[in-house]
């Protein structure tokens, strides 16, 4: 009976020669992939005259490297290597759709690639970075993001009050729970057209007519920078406050009933119960809700793009909407990609600091 060459009982039975062959196999295939990738990059940058017409050789070398890794894991680790093969396809898939696109995007960010140019993309070093440092509209969008993120605190206060209301014994609370969730069921694009383009329309919109009835002679919601920014905040809040309500309501319903009943017996009023019992116990849920809402806020773009296109004068631009317009309106792929990478780095730094602050606060509270 022919012996399975991959079958081993324990790594101790694997010969040093087999282990050495497995390491040589994976490193040689990796070296081959890197050489092909470097040659192709230099060829596209017109630094060398030898190269390939497309990126298929790099794809084939990547597939060869993946096969070599899987086979070498079995050769080196035996049965444990076979178990690793079950997660190996997922790991290689993540590398394919995350790591490689990020590396390609990093390369694009150092080029002058513009889709309207007939010259194609060329390496321009740090020119895109210098352009970003002197771009007032980009820094204005970063300043706007500070306003948008601070608005999350107001959204949280409104969501907490509504969650307390829906958690109380009021008539028709099941009906109101469904009604409050309707904005969350709508897509931001639908909200943009339904509210921003229709209800807030200056001439015939019902909200504008109501504002005239209240005494506002020219109700323009998007002509003034401050009013336009506030309108964007309200539209985005109307869409995502229901999500915060769901999370906070789940936390309120999980509160221990015995503690609340004991506080009532001791004569505590509603404000005392909220300040000393409900809010401290709800602190982990509240902070989690704030973090998740901030993550969604950092991606704010669709409402702004459809309703105001960043206007007036960039007053409502978020970083994401500004980057989208660099791609779509100006076709600046290289510059827009650099802005995306810089924004990604800022988000990672900000969220790391925020999560550490939240963890320390929770540790002190506990």
Question: Positions of the model-derived regions?
Answer:
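Transmembrane alpha-helices
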Residues: 1-79
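A structural signal for multi-pass alpha-helical bundles of membrane permease subunits
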Residues: 36-57, 78-366
């Amino acid at each position: 009976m022919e012996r399975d060459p991959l079958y081993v009982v324990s790594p101790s039975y694997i010969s040093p020669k087999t282990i050495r062959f497995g390491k040589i196999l994976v490193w040689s295939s990796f070296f081959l992939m890197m050489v092909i990738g470097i040659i192709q990059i230099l060829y596209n940058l017109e630094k060398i005259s030898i190269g390939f017409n497309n990126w298929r050789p790099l794809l084939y070398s990547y597939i060869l490297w993946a096969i070599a890794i899987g086979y070498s894991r079995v050769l080196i680790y035996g049965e444990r290597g076979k178990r690793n093969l079950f997660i190996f396809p997922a790991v290689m898939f993540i590398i394919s759709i995350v790591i490689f696109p990020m590396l390609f995007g990093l390369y694009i960010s150092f080029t002058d690639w513009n889709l309207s140019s007939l010259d194609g993309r060329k390496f321009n070093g740090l020119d895109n970075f210098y352009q970003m440092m002197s771009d007032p509209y980009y820094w204005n969008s970063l300043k706007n993001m500070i306003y948008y993120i601070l608005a999350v605190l107001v959204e949280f206060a409104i969501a907490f009050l509504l969650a307390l209301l829906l958690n109380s014994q009021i008539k028709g609370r099941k009906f109101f729970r469904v009604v409050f969730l309707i904005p969350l069921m709508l897509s931001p694009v639908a909200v943009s057209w339904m509210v921003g383009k229709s209800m807030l329309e200056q001439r015939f919109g019902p909200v504008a007519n109501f504002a005239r009835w209240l005494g506002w002679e020219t109700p323009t919601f998007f002509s003034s920078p401050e009013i336009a920014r506030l309108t964007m905040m309200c539209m985005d809040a109307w869409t995502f406050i229901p999500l915060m309500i769901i999370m906070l309501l789940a936390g309120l319903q999980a509160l221990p009933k015995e503690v609340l009943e004991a506080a009532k017996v001791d004569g505590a009023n509603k404000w005392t119960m909220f300040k000393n019992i409900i809010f401290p116990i709800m602190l982990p849920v509240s902070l989690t809700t704030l973090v998740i809402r901030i993550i969604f806020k950092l991606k704010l773009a669709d409402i702004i793009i459809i309703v105001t296109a960043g206007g007036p004068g960039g007053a409502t631009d978020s970083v994401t909407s500004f980057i989208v317009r660099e791609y779509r309106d100006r076709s600046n792929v290289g510059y827009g990609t650099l802005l995306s990478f810089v924004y990604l780095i800022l988000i990672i730094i900000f969220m790391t600091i925020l999560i550490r602050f939240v963890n320390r606060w929770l540790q002190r509270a506990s």
